[in-house]
Amino acid sequence: MNPRKKVDLKLIIVGAIGVGKTSLLHQYVHKTFYEEYQTTLGASILSKIIILGDTTLKLQIWDTGGQERFRSMVSTFYKGSDGCILAFDVTDLESFEALDIWRGDVLAKIVPMEQSYPMVLLGNKIDLADRKVPQEVAQGWCREKDIPYFEVSAKNDINVVQAFEMLASRALSRYQSILENHLTESIKLSPDQSRSRCC
């Protein structure tokens, strides 16, 4: 029996203030709904270990603050991340309209830029009646950017696990691809090195 590979991945969750990022994270990691609203200042980190195929993943998930005045500070936490959950509140049109800014902030901090970077969009609070962002509009935004979309409820635990694990799977694929490319590049011999020489 082969031992499982172990991989550590850093994921981030970003979006406007009040969209439920902390509640989504607590629902995923602890299976509890985080009702008491407190603004996240900077970032907080939770970890979860999951198994995908033959790999044990340790997910370190950074919950970033959504306040405008902290955006430049928060964006420093994006560096070195392997994937991102973009979140908005389906009852708050402004949180949806701000997604391009959040996505742009994340992509501006990711190195190397030429690599694909896994993202998933979550439309949270589908349990509430006063919806302002139609599902079709969010799906259209995602189609343009080739990002998977999930309608979720942190309160009722709808699609939360599926969304996080879709991102984890894509982040793992990217990690493995980068690792393979790096190994391939380091193994290649230059023409001069490949010729055998004699004294």
UniProtKB/Swiss-Prot annotation:
Modified sites of kind Phosphoserine: 186
Q: Which SUPFAM superfamilies match?
A: P-loop containing nucleoside triphosphate hydrolases
How is it placed in the membrane, per its record?
Lipid-anchor
Q: Which InterPro entries match?
A: P-loop_NTPase, Small_GTP-bd, Small_GTPase
Give the subcellular location.
Answer: Late endosome; Lysosome; Golgi apparatus; Golgi apparatus, trans-Golgi network
In its keyword annotation, does this UniProt entry include Transport? yes
Family in the record: Belongs to the small GTPase superfamily. Rab family.
The record's function comment reads: Controls vesicular trafficking from endosomes to the trans-Golgi network (TGN). Acts as a negative regulator of TLR9 signaling and can suppress TLR9-triggered TNFA, IL6, and IFNB production in macrophages by promoting TLR9 lysosomal degradation. Also negatively regulates TLR4 signaling in macrophages by promoting lysosomal degradation of TLR4. Promotes megakaryocytic differentiation by increasing NF-kappa-B-dependent IL6 production and subsequently enhancing the association of STAT3 with GATA1. Not involved in the regulation of the EGF- and EGFR degradation pathway.
Q: What is this protein called?
A: Ras-related protein Rab-7b
Name the source organism: Homo sapiens (Human)
